[in-house]
A protein has these predicted regions:
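Alpha-helical transmembrane segments
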Residues: 6-13, 179, 188
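Membrane/wall-proximal cationic-aromatic binding patches
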Residues: 27-105
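Hydrophobic membrane-insertion alpha-helices, especially the h-region
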Residues: 8-25
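Short, Lys/Arg-rich N-terminal segment immediately upstream of the first membrane anchor
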Residues: 1-5
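Conserved beta-strand elements of the Class I
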Residues: 77-81, 111, 138
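Active-site flanking residues adjacent to catalytic metal/cofactor-binding acidic residues
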Residues: 20, 82-83, 142
């Protein structure tokens, strides 16, 4: 009888674990964050050819790591260059970022060439490497602090939570390691410690 109850208890725990894992993935996009790569020219950028959902919002990056559809040579192209304001992040749906709204309303394709904390020098370095994509015009939108934030090539990709280079194996691992632990025990203990190291591999 005791052994049977133990089996039932384990089965219930496994069911809860699996159900929560599926829910975190399907409804919240855990273990599905946009990934980044390092660049020797412009520090970092979102990896190319990504498409997914995160916290209910759609994100899409084309073959040039732009948060846009592929450049369309049949349309007038304008380059939108900037930092997190233009980038939008995962809390802004693909259709709601400024460049998507502009493209939808004008018929002009505005390519979104941006990343969090990018400054003018990041944008210039990207264009020097990738080209101008046949653009007729371009504009730069950066906040006051990013306008003077020169590239220093500090390692942030895979080091800082905002710039992951690989997915968590389990949504549970991301929930605990990236959100719950740093905001609770991590603050009390003054750092990531062993738990963060372990959950980053989960």
């Amino acid at each position: 009888m005791v052994r049977l109850k133990k089996k039932h208890f384990i089965a219930i725990l496994l069911t809860i674990f699996v159900a929560t894992e599926v829910s975190l993935r399907q409804f919240w996009g855990f273990a599905n964050a946009p990934l980044y790569y390092e660049s020797q020219s412009y520090e970092y950028m979102a990896r190319p050819n990504q498409d997914g959902y995160r916290f209910g919002n759609h994100y899409h990056y084309n073959a040039y790591s732009q948060r846009s559809e592929e450049p369309d040579s049949t349309k007038v192209i304008v380059l939108g260059l900037g930092d997190s304001v233009l980038f939008g992040g995962v809390m802004t749906d693909q259709d709601s970022i400024a460049t998507s709204l502009f493209s939808a309303e004008t018929g002009v394709q505005m390519l979104n060439i941006s990343a969090g904390s990018w400054g003018p020098d990041n944008c210039a370095a990207y264009l020097k490497e990738k080209g101008l994509f046949g653009a007729r015009a371009m504009f730069l939108l950066v906040s006051s602090h990013d306008a003077h934030d020169n590239m220093d090539f500090k390692e942030v990709v895979g080091k800082h939570a905002s710039y992951p280079d690989k997915q968590y194996l389990f949504a549970w691992g991301e929930l605990i390691g990236r959100y719950v632990y740093p905001r609770t025990l991590g603050r009390l203990l003054g750092g990531g410690g062993i738990l963060t190291t372990l959950t980053s591999r989960c």
